[in-house]
């Protein structure tokens, strides 16, 4: 039996390389998705702080108590401090993105029942001994605060003004011009 011609052999390693590259890409995508989910969940306090501070369209139209607001600020900052510096910009944009999604949901369902659909995120905060419960029985708060709908760039400016200063984190200048709604593509 003759040895096989040389030229057919190099094909094997190439396809393996391609497979490895594909696997790496898939892994990276999965990691980014997981990171994004974590960021979005952890940054709910940041979103609430920005919403609250600027009275942007808010599902819980009640104004938060001062103690709760301070707690949200602390939680938000703790999460921002844990995020590596190169991801902080992404984190702020995730907050902005979440606020924009939140506004869009608000627009779609402006019936009174939307009061309760946004109670969920509050339960996720690690608040200790159940000291805070969303004050659902607060009828006079409904409709008393007229939330404003803001365009994307204004929300982004507000978030960039509020969060880095509040938590004393450094956000690089290019962060202000990062694109919207396209996360994990670069």
Swiss-Prot record:
SUPFAM superfamilies according to UniProt: Bifunctional inhibitor/lipid-transfer protein/seed storage 2S albumin
Keywords: Allergen, Repeat, Seed storage protein, Storage protein
Region (Disordered): 1-20
A molecular function GO annotation: nutrient reservoir activity
Pfam families associated with the record: Gliadin
Superkingdom in the source lineage: Eukaryota
Keyword Cell wall biogenesis/degradation set for record: no
Post-translational modification: Substrate of transglutaminase.
Role: Gliadin is the major seed storage protein in wheat.
Other observations noted: The alpha/beta-gliadins can be divided into 5 homology classes. Sequence divergence between the classes is due to single base substitutions and to duplications or deletions within or near direct repeats. There are more than a 100 copies of the gene for alpha/beta-gliadin per haploid genome.
Family, similarity comment: Belongs to the gliadin/glutenin family.
Name of the protein in its database record: Alpha/beta-gliadin clone PTO-A10
């Amino acid at each position: 039996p003759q040895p096989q011609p040389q030229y057919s052999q190099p094909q094997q390693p190439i396809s393996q390389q391609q497979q490895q590259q594909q696997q790496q890409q898939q892994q990276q995508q999965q990691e980014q998705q997981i990171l994004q989910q974590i960021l979005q969940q952890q940054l709910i306090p940041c979103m609430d702080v920005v919403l609250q501070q600027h009275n942007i369209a808010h599902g819980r139209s009640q104004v938060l108590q001062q103690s709760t607001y301070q707690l949200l600020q602390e939680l938000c900052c703790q999460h921002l401090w844990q995020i590596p510096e190169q991801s902080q910009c992404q984190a702020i944009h995730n907050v902005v993105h979440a606020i924009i999604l939140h506004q869009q949901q608000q627009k779609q369902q402006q019936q009174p029942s939307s009061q309760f659909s946004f109670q969920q995120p509050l339960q996720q905060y690690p608040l200790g001994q159940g000291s805070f419960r969303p004050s659902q029985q607060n009828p006079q708060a409904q409709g008393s605060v007229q939330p404003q709908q803001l365009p994307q760039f204004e929300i982004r400016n507000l978030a960039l003004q509020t969060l880095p200063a509040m938590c004393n984190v450094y956000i690089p200048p290019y962060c202000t011009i990062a694109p919207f709604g396209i996360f994990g593509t670069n």
